[in-house]
A protein has these predicted regions:
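Extended, loop-rich substrate-binding clefts of extracytoplasmic carbohydrate-active enzymes
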Residues: 80-133, 143-145
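Short, acidic Ser/Thr/Gly-rich low-complexity loop/linker segments typical of extracellular
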Residues: 321-338
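Structured interaction patches on ligand/partner-binding surfaces of diverse proteins
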Residues: 355-374, 378-381
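Beta-strand-rich domain onsets/edges
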Residues: 274-300
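A short, solvent-exposed beta-strand micro-motif common in secreted/extracellular proteins
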Residues: 335, 344-355
């Protein structure tokens, strides 16, 4: 027979095993199912299905490269009335392939003629990194549209949204809000591209956003205004528009644009780490994306300062050529500016007082180099001219 100490030891062993069993049972209920997901992909005859290993699972159609499903925390937010999320106006039959370049990256490549679209997932992130490569005019519109189910998001009547429930004035693109008397254009937002980092929508529990790219291959410069979001009870669309061909006076640029990021959140704003000026991109260098130029192949321009600046005006320094465009804000106090991650080449540098060009020169950027400019004096501001009288001021 067991003595008293042996019985006590046996009881303690049983209780310990019971406690461990109960803890495991409880954890099975409190750990979200998404946390048990494995990073990876599967495929069938219709779709590639990518599990990010976080809360996002998405599908890409093997026929044309559309995103056909965006499942976040178990709910599919993609599409409406048989429309998916897609590049350009949607592609025809395409060559769509999938690969896993590393243990933490999955990439889908879509080739349609001379257009290439890339979707990249990183392990443990609720983000899809996207890139678009165009080589010629066979691609008429350079844009990406994320289409979301309208029943899952509120209708937002804001100044940077196109709201198609207004009364139509002209060509199905110009609308009026009879309650306020305001007129809206589908293709003209009140928000300049330099003034926003992302566009999107939230229902309080889930947010879906496009974090814009640096727009180096876009058209229009820092003050470009275009369609950003439309939002009604029948459609929610988020846009990354690089070239739309709406009588634009700037050149159409070719090559690779990206990354721009489709980011899902638990209702809040996307992380500022995804912003074009903040995003770390060294992990992209080894993916073999057509046209990609890493940070080592780029350069910088810095200006010591700007003289003859007028108070109460913002000064922006823009750079452009036929291959790329960039911009940066000058310091309000002394006009210091720095523009980083520029592709090599010779650029027209323009200083803007608000949106008025007041100084222009050429600068050359080299890979890995920094071009330092001595203090610049603005000489082309018409506000400096003597006049008899003037209403307002020149500001573009």
């Amino acid at each position: 027979m067991k003595n008293e100490s042996q019985l006590k030891s046996s009881k303690r062993g049983v209780l310990l095993r019971l406690a461990i069993f109960m803890a495991l049972m409880i954890s099975a209920f409190i750990i979200p199912s998404s946390a048990l997901a494995d990073f990876g992909y599967t495929e069938d005859s219709t779709n590639y299905t990518i599990d990010t290993g976080a809360n996002l699972v998405f599908k890409v159609k093997r026929s044309n490269g559309d995103i056909s499903s965006l499942i976040y925390n178990g709910t599919d937010y993609n599409g409406y009335t048989n429309k998916n999320s897609h590049v350009e106006i949607g592609l025809g039959q395409s060559d769509v392939t999938i690969s896993q370049p590393s243990s933490s990256v999955i990439m889908v490549k879509v080739v349609y003629g001379t257009l290439e679209q890339y979707y990249v997932a990183r392990k443990g992130e609720n983000n899809i990194y996207m890139f678009t490569y165009i080589a010629d005019d066979s691609v008429t519109v350079t844009r990406y549209i994320v289409r979301l189910k309208p029943s899952l998001f509120p209708v937002l009547n804001t100044s940077n949204s196109w709201y198609s429930s207004y009364s139509t004035l002209e060509a199905k693109d110009i609308f009026t809000d009879t309650s306020t008397g305001y007129t809206y254009s589908k293709h003209y937002s009140d928000t300049r591209v330099m003034d926003y980092n992302y566009t999107g929508i939230s229902n309080g529990n889930v947010g879906a956003y496009i974090v814009r790219s640096n727009h180096e291959k876009a058209s229009g410069g820092p003050f470009y205004r275009s369609l950003i979001r439309d939002n009604t009870n029948v459609a929610v669309n988020l846009y990354e528009i690089l070239y739309y061909g709406m009588a634009q006076t700037d050149v159409k640029r070719y090559g690779l644009q990206g990354p721009y990021v489709l980011a899902f959140t638990d209702g809040g704003e996307p992380s500022s780490k995804l912003y074009a000026g903040n995003l770390k991109t060294d992990w992209i260098d080894s993916l073999g994306i057509h046209g990609w130029v890493g940070s080592s192949g780029r350069g910088r321009v810095a200006g010591v300062g700007i003289k003859n600046m007028k108070s109460d005006y913002e000064y922006v320094v823009g750079f452009s050529n036929d291959e790329a465009q960039y911009w940066t804000k000058a310091s309000d106090s002394n006009g210091y500016f720095s523009c980083t991650n520029m592709l090599p080449g010779t650029y027209t540098m323009t200083i803007y007082k608000n949106e008025l060009a007041v100084y222009t020169t050429d600068v050359t950027v080299t890979a890995g180099g920094t071009k330092i400019l001595n203090s610049i004096t603005i000489t082309d501001d018409p506000s400096d001219n003597d006049v008899t009288w003037r209403i307002g001021d020149w500001d573009g």
